[in-house]
Amino acid sequence: SMLMVMGTSTCYQMMHRNKIAFDGVCAIVRDGMIPGLEAYESGQPAVGDTFAWFADNMLPQQYQQAADEGMSVLAYMDRLCGQLKAGESGLVALDWFNGNRSVLMNYGLRGVIAGLSLASRPEEIYRSLIEATAFGARRIFDSYTQAGVGIEKVYAAGGLARKSPVTMQIYADILNRPITATSISNSSSLGAAVCAAVA
């Protein structure tokens, strides 16, 4: 099973009986999570940060009406982009706005949004950024599968997993598998507390 801890960045963690080194894995640690198993870790350096950058820098004033409706700007954008079909806008993006951790491990790479026109709307750009991060996740999943480290189930924790059903559905569609999101609001803090309690 793969765990995606989704927040400002996304950390991918899973355990496997065997150590299989392959491109795109940031670390493999024996007994790193559970004694007797190899703990694998990969990641994307900017996921929630990309969405926040977009909301802070790219939205025209009329989209700030979300505050008048009592919701965050990103929740408002989720609502708008949830009404769009996949590929409807023709926009394509690469999620390298803070470089690439997995699988290329090159922090000098930069993000791209292609297909923009004078008719491109903010919600279309926002959806292209969500899709870009989801395809980045797909590339990570594919590297595990191609190396023989199978992924049977997918779990998601962190702020994005709880706050954005639209993002989670886009990820599930692009990964072509269901995702189970935790209902715990601060799962990382809870996990740290459990580890401290049993140490």
Per-region residue spans from a language model:
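Active-site core segments that coordinate phosphate-bearing ligands/cofactors
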Residues: S1-A199
